[in-house]
Curated annotation (Swiss-Prot):
Family: Belongs to the HisA/HisF family.
Its job: IGPS catalyzes the conversion of PRFAR and glutamine to IGP, AICAR and glutamate. The HisF subunit catalyzes the cyclization activity that produces IGP and AICAR from PRFAR using the ammonia provided by the HisH subunit.
Disulfide bonds: none
Keyword field: Amino-acid biosynthesis, Cytoplasm, Histidine biosynthesis, Lyase
Designated gene of the protein: hisF2
One Gene Ontology biological process: L-histidine biosynthetic process
Protein name (Swiss-Prot/TrEMBL): Putative imidazole glycerol phosphate synthase subunit hisF2
Major place of residence: cytoplasm
Organism in which the protein naturally occurs: Parasynechococcus marenigrum (strain WH8102)
Length: 269
C-alpha cells in the first residue's frame, strides 16, 4: 500500500500570511506573527509536506518571497513546494536555490507551457506540481488561473488532453467553491483526473477539521490531502489529525519520529 500524505499550505500575500475563503483573502499576520503566536515548526513535524503559495494581488517580489522560503526551510525538515507568480525558469530557479524541493505552476502551466518543460529539463519531472483551480457550474466545471481571475476556455476533457503531455509529477486540485468554507473536500474530479492522467492527486479546499482530512485520505483516487486553514490546524490540530488518520487501517501514512521543538530563525545563518 502506497503511503498517503498530509500537507499544510501557507498562503502568502504582500508580506502577510492569509486565510482564504472562495479566494477572497483575510490578512492574519506576517512572519514574525507566525513565529510569535504559533510554534509552526513543531506543527510541521506532523505533516508530510509543506506548500507555500505567493498569492499576492499586487506586484510580486520573487526575491522577498524566496527569503521567506529560505527562513522557513531552515527549521522545517519536510519537503517544501513553492508556487505563485512563477512566470519563467529564472523565477523557479530562485525558489529552488532558497529551499524549494518542488515548484507549483498554475497560470504559466496554461499560458506558457514551455516554462514547465524548461524546469523539468533541468530539475526533473518530479520537481513540478500542476495546480488546477475549479468551480462547479450547473453540473459542469469551470477552470481558472491567476488567483481565480481568468477562466480557462477548456472543458474537462480538453484540459486533460492539454495537460497529458506536460512534464509534472502530481496534480493539486483546488476547489474555489469549498475554499475556506470548512465543509469538506470536493471529491468529484479526483477519479477523472487520476484515471485519465495517472498522476497522484492532492486535494485542497474545504478541510475544516480532522474528519475532513481523514475522509479525503480514505478516497481511493487521492494520494494526499492539504489544508490552508491556519487557525484550525496550527497548534495541536495537525498532530490530532494525523493520529486520527493513523487509527484507520485503510490509511497508510509515514510514521515520523517526533522532532524536538525549536524556534524559528528569521535571518539567514
Amino acid at each position: 500500500m502506497s503511503k498517503k500524505r498530509i500537507i499544510f499550505v501557507l498562503l502568502y500575500c504582500d508580506g502577510f500570511f492569509c486565510l482564504s475563503r472562495n479566494f477572497k483573502l483575510q490578512r492574519i499576520g506576517d512572519f514574525r506573527w507566525l513565529q510569535r503566536n504559533y510554534n509552526f515548526n513543531y506543527s510541521a513535524t506532523f505533516i508530510d509536506e509543506l506548500i507555500i503559495l505567493d498569492i499576492s494581488r499586487k506586484s510580486r517580489d520573487i526575491n522577498k518571497f524566496a527569503t521567506l522560503l529560505y527562513n522557513l526551510s531552515e527549521n522545517i525538515f519536510v519537503p517544501i513546494t513553492a508556487g505563485g507568480g512563477i512566470r519563467s525558469f529564472e523565477d523557479a530557479k530562485v525558489l529552488f536555490e532558497n529551499g524549494a524541493d518542488k515548484v507549483c505552476l498554475n497560470t504559466s502551466l496554461i499560458q506558457c507551457p514551455h516554462v514547465s518543460e524548461k524546469i523539468s529539463s533541468v530539475y526533473g519531472q518530479q520537481s513540478l506540481v500542476a495546480s488546477i483551480d475549479f468551480k462547479h457550474d450547473h453540473g459542469d466545471f469551470k477552470f481558472f488561473i491567476d488567483n481565480g481571475l481568468i477562466e480557462v476556455q477548456y472543458n474537462i476533457q480538453e484540459l486533460i488532453s492539454f495537460l497529458d503531455p506536460l512534464p509534472f509529477c502530481e496534480i493539486l486540485l483546488q476547489s474555489v467553491d469549498r475554499d475556506g468554507t470548512g465543509t469538506g473536500f470536493d471529491l468529484t474530479l479526483a477519479n477523472t483526473f487520476r484515471d485519465q492522467l495517472s498522476k497522484p492527486i492532492i486535494l485542497l479546499g474545504g478541510a475544516g477539521h480532522s474528519d475532513h482530512l481523514v475522509e479525503g485520505l480514505l478516497h481511493q483516487s487521492t494520494d494526499a490531502v492539504a489544508t490552508a486553514h491556519l487557525l484550525n490546524f496550527v497548534g495541536d490540530g495537525l498532530k490530532l489529525s494525523r493520529e486520527q488518520a493513523q487509527r484507520h487501517s485503510e490509511v497508510s501514512l509515514a510514521r515520523w519520529p517526533l522532532l524536538s521543538s525549536t524556534s524559528f530563525s528569521t535571518t539567514k545563518h
